Amino acid sequence: VIEAFNKMPDKRLFVIGGGPNLEKYKKMAGSNITFMGYQPFAVLKEKMQHAKAFIFAADEDFGMIPVEAESCGTPVIGLGHGGSLETVSEGETGLFFYEQTPEAIMDAVNRFESLGEMPFDYHVCRKWAEVFSEERFKKEIRLFVETKYAEFSYNHNITI
């Protein structure tokens, strides 16, 4: 992502967080890239709510950060592998790139910007994020357990 934005000096990138390679990334970053380090949740949320897009280049089984961005109404430009395929709805809440290369990221950013000023609906992103909410998870688990218990009780003539 850093390399891609170095090749797009007219575009701004804010990096929040840290990690073992942070100093290396800072040294290679151009003036259009701002490193903010670790931030409290309120600052992270505010930045996500005002971002054009959230770029997610990690290949994770299930990354929560894209869902957090979507819950702020922010579309995701994400790697089209792993959990992003579940957490990002292409064309609805964001778009994908399929290689972890600066060129693929640049292409995705340019495709995103070619869609216009507000290419993804804030409300659609937020609604999609609700699919992954704790409340929905609890409700569906409870329903699943109750259904299986009822089936088992019926099949084994168990009454309470």
State where each predicted segment sits.
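A charged, aromatic-enriched C-terminal amphipathic alpha-helix characteristic of glycosyltransferases
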Residues: 100-103, 117-160
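Nucleotide-activated donor-binding/catalytic signature segment of Leloir-type glycosyltransferases, i.e.
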Residues: 22-43
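Short hydrophobic signal-anchor/transmembrane segments that target glycosyltransferases
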Residues: 1-12, 18-24
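Short alpha-helical donor nucleotide-sugar binding micro-motif in glycosyltransferases
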Residues: 46-51, 69, 141
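Acidic donor-binding loop of glycosyltransferase active sites
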Residues: 49-61, 74
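Short hydrophobic beta-strand element within catalytic cores of glycosyltransferases
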Residues: 75-80, 88
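Conserved acidic donor-binding segment of nucleotide-sugar-dependent glycosyltransferases
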Residues: 37, 90-91, 95-103, 110-117
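Short alpha-helical segment that forms part of, or immediately flanks, the ligand-binding pocket
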Residues: 45, 67-71, 85-86, 92
